[in-house]
Each structure stands twice: as C-alpha cells, then as structure tokens.
Amino acid sequence: MTLNWLRRDNELKDHALLGEEYFGTEAPSVIYERRPITDPQGNTVAGLFASWIILNNPTQYNSYTTEMVKAVIAGFQRASSDRAVVAVVFTAVGDKAFCTGGNTAEYSAYYSKRPNEYGEYMDLFNAMVDGILNCKKPVICRVNGMRVGGGQEIGMATDLTITSDLAIFGQAGPKHGSAPDGGSTDFLPWMLNMEDAMYNCVSCEPWSAYKMRAKNLVTKVVPVLKKDGEWVRNPLVRTDAYVDDGELVYGEAVAADQVKAAKELMAQCTTDFSKLDAAVNELVWKFTNLFPHCLIKSIDGIRGKKKFFWDQFKLANRHWLAVNMNHEAYLGFNAFDAKKVTGKDVIDFVKYRQLVAEGALFDDKLAEQVLAKPKA
C-alpha cells in the first residue's frame, strides 16, 4: 500500500527574505558570490556552493557603512536559506584589512549627537551579528588583513577563523570614545581566559595573528608573503621561539632594532593569498563531507554559549551606545575622523580627566579644550 492519497506539494519554496538589491560591486558595498565547491584535486562539484560575503570598502579599511550593514544582513539570510550552499566565507577586498569596524566618517559627521539615529543604526548592527550567529551554514572568517574594533566583533561572531599572518586583532573603543559592546565584551571571555580578555578588551593594543593562534582565538594562521617562490612568515613577528629568557615571545613583535630589516624583507616580497584560500577551501571541503543537519546542530550547540551573554546584554548595550553618542563618542570619533586636519587621532586624555575632576560641563567649550586644533 502506498501513501499517494496524501496531499503533497513538491514545488520548492524560496525562503530568501531579501533580494539582491543590497549587494553591489562598487565601493563602498558588499559583494555576494556563490562559488562552486571544489574537491582537493580542483574538480568542481555540481550543484553545491560556498557563499562568499565580501566587505568592499578598501580605501577605508573595509569599515562598514550603514548600507553595508544592511547588505551583510541580507547576505547571511540569503546564504542561510540557500539549500545548495555548504558554507559561508566572510571576508573582504584587498590585503590590508578584513574590517576595522564602523565607518568613523558616518559616526562623527552624522551619528554623533544624534543618539536616536545611532540607536536605530545599532538595531541594524545587532541584526548583523544575529544574522551571523543564526546562519544555518557554518561560517568561516577569512581574515585578509587587520580585524579590529567592530571588525573583530563580527569576526568573532563567525564559527572559525583562518587568517593571513599579516593580520592584527584587537579593540579600539576605550581609546576612541566607545566600549566594544557590539560583541567583544560578550565573546572575548569565552574565547580567551578572563585575564587576557580583559587586557585585550581595554588596552587597545593590537595582537598578531600568531599570538591569537597561541591564545586559541583563531583556528589557523598561514603566510601570505612570497620571495623567490618561497613562503616567508611575517618578519615583524616572533615565530622562531616560544620562550626567550623566560618570557613568552611567540607571536610578539620583533625587537625594535630588527624592525627596519623586517620591513626591507617585506618590501622584497609579493603578497599571495593562494595558501589562505587553499586553507579555506580545505575547511569547506571538510564540511561538505559531513552530514549537513548533524553539522549545523553541532555548530548551533556551540554557538549557544557565545549567544548566551550576547543575548543577555545586546539590548542594554544598544541603549548605552546610543546615549554615548552625546558623550565620549562625540569626542572620540570626531578626533579620529579629523586626524588629517589636526595630525592627531585622539583627544588630550589628561586634560579631559582634569576637566572631569573639576566637574566641568560636557559642552562645546569642553570639547574645544580636549580636541586637537587644526594644523596651521
């Protein structure tokens, strides 16, 4: 006996919420590509793809504009609902930066002193992070350059990171008028120990890709420099030893007297991302050969721990970040945006603290005293 008497509808549904209207090719934009899966021999696998979501704003270190945030949301929803997609690769254009976070030109010129507007922007930002964390495909962050500030936050929202060894990682908020409450204060204590998480969060010091590998924040680090056909590991970073004179040195900067020679060596090299792409493709192929539903259930089980504190704090953080646009963000983002005019990208912190200690009003008079003056 068959069950052909039961009603069935076998026409495939389209679960994509958004079309392609948010994607583009001219910077600033987000490029969305559906690239065929290839096996280890380079053969194309019919009918299966990896979605590449590519930040495209290289002249501003791939910082995301408001419209780019919308496009990232659209990209992850599209990839998540595409039954032919095996995995998502989240990356960026160029060799300098994966992402440095929000666009400070927008932040300073438009959003500062407009807290309601920034609150609405944060609704989009939170939706972008949620889109990454909720994507029903494994998400690989292919780090082609620096991943700092909000770029570090959206990068840590992904499932696994494979990075160029020229990349640096870190936060910038406390130095430039904000707090990394777009994910870093939630994710860092999971991904690093509490001491490292605290220091990395508040020091605003960039850490090398190798240091982050040693700290287990990234999955794999690959060289991208080549000289005479041979791979050259980042000469600005110690990879020759783990301990030197009792100090942990792996992933730390080389000594000051070695920097000049390191930069000279880098100038003789070419940049080649083929090894990075091979590592990404190897991971995508690994995913291809796993049960898809068992894979995503396993991933969502791990993600749930990352999401726990993110979901607890994202709304309260949204409101604080909005209000802060009337406060220290106004100073910090404008100082950073005006650095070509003033020659300085931060405020006079000592003067600011002195004014705070005096109980000074937070007004334009205060701002004039702590912001650098335009160069003559």
Regions found by a protein language model. Give the residues of each.
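Glycine- (often His-adjacent) and acidic-residue-rich active-site loop
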Residues: 7, 13, 17-22, 92-128, ...
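Short amphipathic alpha-helices within nucleic acid-binding modules
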Residues: 61-64
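A structural preference for short, pocket-lining loop segments at secondary-structure junctions
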Residues: 46-56, 70-113, 130-141, 160, ...
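Crotonase-fold acyl-CoA enzyme core
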Residues: 131-292
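Hydrophobic alpha-helical segments typical of transmembrane helices
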Residues: 124-128, 184-187, 196, 297, ...
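C-terminal alpha-helix plus adjacent terminal tail
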Residues: 1-49, 95, 208-210, 225-376
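Glycine-centered loop/turn positions within well-structured domains
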Residues: 59, 95-96, 186, 198
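An acidic, glycine-rich surface segment that forms the CoA-thioester-binding/catalytic face
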Residues: 7, 69-73, 77-80, 104-144, ...
